[in-house]
Every structure is written in C-alpha cells, then in structure tokens.
Amino acid sequence: MVTASTLYALAQQPPTPTRVRGTVESVDGDTLAVKSRSGDDVKLHMAGNMVVLGLTRIGLSDIKVGSFIGTTTVPGPDGVPKAVEVHVFPENMRGTGEGSRPYDLKPNSSMTNATVAQSVVGNDGHTLQVKYKDGEKTVQVTPDTPVVTYVPGDRADLKAGAKIIAFMKKLPDGSLETDRVSVGRDGLTPPM
C-alpha cells in the first residue's frame, strides 16, 4: 500500500535532467563516464542506436536567410532576446525540435529552433527574425556569440577529454541512458 508520505517523498524527488554537459572521462564498452560542468560524475549507458554528432565553429556570416537554426536566448536589456549561442542545422536535420521552449542553460533562457526569415546586419551584430510553426521571434546575435554547426561523428569521437552534451533518460532500474551525444571538435565546448 502506498502511503501519503511515500507519495510526498516521490513528489519531492528532483527531476532527472534530460541532458548532461561536460567532459568525457572514459568509455568502457557501452558505458560513457562524464564529469559534468557542475563537477558530478555521471555514468551513461550508450544505446545501441545512439547518434553521435560533431560540432564545429562557423562564422556569424554563415547564418543565412532560410537556414534552420537553434538558438539559446536570454532576455536582453531592450526586451529583444539575446543569443547565448546559435547552432546551424544541416539540411537533413531541418525541423529538429522546431518551436520555442524554456531551456536549462542559463536562468530565464529559452531554446528556439526555427528558420531564419530575415537577417539585418548592424554595428553590434545581426538581428535575426526567425519563424517556427507556432510563432516567430526576433533575436540579437552579437559578434562574440558562439556559432556552430553539426558535422558527422561517431563513437570514436567520444574519448577522454572530449567536451560533450548528451541527451539522456532515466531507465526503470534508475540508470541513465543516452541515445544522442554532440561532441565538440578541435577543443570546442558545445555552447548549448
């Protein structure tokens, strides 16, 4: 029989994060050991169908009208969302996670995956108008905003010292599993 105190205790459990950002410590078979940015040791089971994508730096000028992008934004001082990072999806990933939702990178941040409808170049960067199925957003991208794109990757990229973001879920036995990992190339720390 489940008691009210048991239900209360379960309700108080912190939610399992859906992603971990950090540095690969080791790979042992199907286990990926990661030191999270917050210093926690995290062990992830790598699913058999796991996808590994590389991330590489590109320039702000590589963001074109028609590009499908993801951007983490925070509220700007003038009310216009300011990009913390921008990732340009390759054409075969168009539509991935389309929309805008809260995100856990920074306080009050959101993630928006959308198509660039307009880009205006100014003295302090670009102002992007992005559109997604349920809306649109204006985003300020400064010259110092990290801009990256995805490139093919594989499990061999997951070696000690690599900087990653892994998307994970909690399994019924309490362990964590990942089926998607993005790994920075050439020393890049995934900015998202």
Where are these regions (language model features)?
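Sec-dependent N-terminal signal peptides
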Residues: M1-S5
